[in-house]
Amino acid sequence: MAKTLYQKVFDAHVVREVEGETPLIYIDRHLVHEVTSPQAFDGLRAMNRQLRRPDLTWATMDHNVSTTTKDIAASGEMARIQMETLAANCKEFGVRLYDLNHKYQGIVHVMGPELGITLPGTTIVCGDSHTATHGAFGSLAFGIGTSEVEHVMATQTLKQGRAKTMRISVNGKLAAGISAKDVVLAIIGRVGHAGGTGYVVEFAGEAIEGLTMEGRMTVCNMAIELGAKAGMIAPDQTTIDYIRGKEFAPKGETLEQAIAYWQSLKSDEGARFDAEVVLDAADIAPQVTWGTNPGQVIAVNEPIPAPESFSDLMEQQSARKALAYMDLQPGQKLSDVAIDKVFIGSCTNSRIEDLRAAAAIARGRKVAAGVQALVVPGSEQVKAQAEAEGLDKIFIEAGFEWRLPGCSMCLAMNNDRLQPGERCASTSNRNFEGRQGRAGRTHLVSPAMAAAAAVTGRFADIRAL
């Protein structure tokens, strides 16, 4: 029987499947951070259990960390406790930890791929909803809750039902200047922020195949934002070239054997998907969200839609509420809207290619008066590479703040946040009410669009700069 990529990876990991019961699958990689792990470690301790596979477990500090200092207490008492607890737990249970002073420290979903921890055909979990990022490699990667974190720690397995399958194809070539972030925002705008609920989505088509690995990670990172369980992209030569030579990647003959297997990881001809969506790459323009979920998105040169333009009553109500929260009007152009802050970072867009794209816009320009602009590299490795290329100097000379790695302003769990009423052009993945700070107003954009907003003081079409 013809199988999809998802079905192949899922089936390869089934440990036990009995009729009438949820399948038990093996987990190949477990990524851990300071926020969702403390209770899981406590659970192991309470039952006198050991960690089943410390060699398949990696931990880092990212959510709570300060991006201005390596001081563990800089983000407050709760943050300090969580990070100190993670360090103590990792020491007790034998987990490798990349703490604030380690050269591999960074956002967990940036760290995993750049170190070769993330590999095609593997199952990867983390107590974080954007674990879908790793699906860019053809892995089955998804976020789990703290009780499931404990279950994986104790057994290296997880009960998982089979999801429905959706293929989203982006056909044709992207226009110049259109990024992976624009692609995925356009997809979410088309499918809706809940359109993928119950599905594992495979992204396909010429435009997806033409993306770099970092671009593919951006797309899969936001699969959760259309409601999907996970997002996947079939591995190819681009994937193999990216993995080769990474710290934890296979080497020598083992790598060649792995490549032979990875090349089989694609949906078979005739494989049946439960849903299919097709977009034309030529139709995708630079995107900006206007509302309070990622599906409320338009091209930068389009007017904000009227609530009455939506056929669904719930969508109409959501649009009215979003416009009120965002202090926007139907018909208004986002190019006429001034901003207060810019955030370039997060597990969606903090990799070296993202910083290069933003720096290309920032070069020779200045941050607009009254705008605070932060650039937060996704890891120490990214930071070092950017500094070796002189990107930090470009940003600093333009008036951006060059920060230390961390989740930063993506979520209001550290000192980087919006004040009530502040409007932010952000390269992160969520624009929910209060996501970046109480009563803050978030607009999701690509790194280039964020840099353009910083230097113009409002949302600007990068094609016109």
From Swiss-Prot:
Residues involved in [4Fe-4S] cluster binding: 347, 407, 410
Top EC class of this enzyme: lyase
Keywords, sorted A to Z: 4Fe-4S, Amino-acid biosynthesis, Branched-chain amino acid biosynthesis, Iron, Iron-sulfur, Leucine biosynthesis, Lyase, Metal-binding
EC number: 4.2.1.33
Pathway in which the depicted protein is active: Amino-acid biosynthesis; L-leucine biosynthesis; L-leucine from 3-methyl-2-oxobutanoate: step 2/4
Free-text comment on the cofactor: Binds 1 [4Fe-4S] cluster per subunit.
Cofactor: [4Fe-4S] cluster
GO BP terms: L-leucine biosynthetic process
Signal peptide: none
Pfam families: Aconitase
Catalysed conversion reaction: (2R,3S)-3-isopropylmalate = (2S)-2-isopropylmalate
GO molecular function, one term: metal ion binding
UniProt-listed PANTHER family: 3-ISOPROPYLMALATE DEHYDRATASE, HOMOACONITASE, MITOCHONDRIAL-RELATED
Family: Belongs to the aconitase/IPM isomerase family. LeuC type 1 subfamily.
Subunit details: Heterodimer of LeuC and LeuD.
Protein role: Catalyzes the isomerization between 2-isopropylmalate and 3-isopropylmalate, via the formation of 2-isopropylmaleate.
Protein known as: 3-isopropylmalate dehydratase large subunit
